[in-house]
Swiss-Prot record:
Enzyme Commission number(s): 3.2.1.4
Gene Ontology, cellular component aspect: membrane
Active site: residue positions: 166, 513, 561, 570
Coiled-coil ranges per UniProt: none
Name used for this protein in its record: Endoglucanase 12
GO BP terms in the entry: cell wall organization; cellulose catabolic process
Glycosylation sites recorded in the entry for this protein: 217, 236, 324, 345, 408, 425
Xref: PROSITE patterns: GH9_1 (PS60032), GH9_2 (PS00592), GH9_3 (PS00698)
Gene, per the UniProt record: GLU3
Broadest EC class assigned to this enzyme: hydrolase
The entry's keywords: Carbohydrate metabolism, Cell wall biogenesis/degradation, Cellulose degradation, Glycoprotein, Glycosidase, Hydrolase, Membrane, Polysaccharide degradation, Signal-anchor, Transmembrane, Transmembrane helix
Organism name: Oryza sativa subsp. japonica
Amino acid sequence: MYSANHWGGSFEIAADGAAEDDHSRNMDLDRGALSARQHQLDETQQSWLLGPPEAKKKDKYVDLGCVVVKRKLLWWVLWTLLAAFILIGLPVIIAKSIPKKKPHAPPPDQYTDALHKALLFFNAQKSGRLPKNNGIKWRGNSGLSDGSDLTDVKGGLVGGYYDAGDNIKFHFPLAFSMTMLSWSVIEYSAKYKAVGEYDHVRELIKWGTDYLLLTFNSSASTIDKVYSQVGIAKINGTQPDDHYCWNRPEDMAYPRPVQTAGSAPDLGGEMAAALAAASIVFRDNAAYSKKLVNGAAAVYKFARSSGRRTPYSRGNQYIEYYYNSTSYWDEYMWSAAWMYYATGNNTYITFATDPRLPKNAKAFYSILDFSVFSWDNKLPGAELLLSRLRMFLNPGYPYEESLIGYHNTTSMNMCTYFPRFGAFNFTKGGLAQFNHGKGQPLQYTVANSFLAALYADYMESVNVPGWYCGPYFMTVDDLRSFARSQVNYILGDNPKKMSYVVGYGKKYPRRLHHRGASTPHNGIKYSCTGGYKWRDTKGADPNVLVGAMVGGPDKNDQFKDARLTYAQNEPTLVGNAGLVAALVALTNSGRGAGVTAVDKNTMFSAVPPMFPATPPPPSKWKP
């Protein structure tokens, strides 16, 4: 409290200047000391609340120039990279520096082994001027004068294949054999490559198709005839021909007339199928593939000519007894399917799915024999071929209705293969009697075993586990097991414990009904009847016809290894073509993990996209 100024005047105290300055300096010093003490006090108070001060840390970051990272993270990354190099990189470097041995191919299964041999049969059946690498030492050039009297074929009809144990060239079964080989290559090219037979089988196909192109004017768009056969065999004939004589092909000295067909819906259809299928096989050779397609189109047009609908074999005594065609509607369906796949032209698939075609072919009738695939009945093969289109591409309208019918019929055909349903008889040894106990049963066995294995692979490729036979569900494995059982029978799993493929296994036929195999290759040219002693001898063949599948046993599993029992002991082109197809379908060679059972796409390489064309724009609106 301030006291009152009882004396009057100012409250200020007067002082001299020097004293004033000293006082001010002392006040500044006191403030500085007080401030210092206050700062120390603040730090002390903070220490009470926060604890003792931390020691000053080292710099935690590293400047790499382009980026700044934590020192700890940088060390962690470096150590991780070093560990990865030691664990992964170093072993890889060491492994690559070690010289590698070529990996051993997996051991071939029995089907692969038999396949190598079965293909050699075609080398032995070649006619014409043989290549140096043909591989059959006891075969030479033959048939070099075939068709030499024809004025419209330059060089004659030289080449092709002899049909069986005689020296006739039947063009109908020859064409079917080439179709079968081509189909097997299209579906299973990876397997052929894996077993080293891809180039070989293509060469065999080309040998056949080159010859087929000679049998008509393949450079023309319209033709009026085809040559259907070279060589003849008259029933009970007494004049030299291909049955009366017993000669090696190289020693033939008798007439070999050429048969001509001005009407051939069946033969023309099969030839078109063979050339069209081969054009897909040789799609990597554009010029040759185009040549095949053009030839196929010409002979297909000839086959479909409305004024040429008489079967090629009718009334011809040199054909009708051996390869008589019972219908041509199956060849129409078969060839149309192949022409569509080869060209992508919708005209062919439109015809193949026209409801009138299966009606005329009786494709949807419940006729048991129509379910058996053979050189004479293409219906089961054509139906499966068209089912392929539905299963993989599903084109829908307007083809769907007929394709469903073909697919359902294919499934029913497969049902007939199982003994439990009693459609066909089976021998006690397990062989299906597709031709009802007649001669040459094995050619039917292998053809239908191929279809069974192929259909199983189709279903597996689209993740379908099986299908219904009435109330019974049959699996893909059931179907494949049937095919295996039939082929295994042929390879030796039968009551006779013998292989029906020459050269396969330890026990196989050694007295074939085959002129070339039975007549020694000893430099002697035997006459027409001079070869009879080799026909009639009971000795084994001097030339082993490796890979030849014989006709097969009778309905009681019995087999007579005698040269004159041609129904059992004669091999044929169609038989071996079916055998090759069945073997490549069943072998596991070339099927690695993740590899589909069949080549799904090559067949469709010419087929356009399956979607409708863009509709035309609407017309202009007018009020």
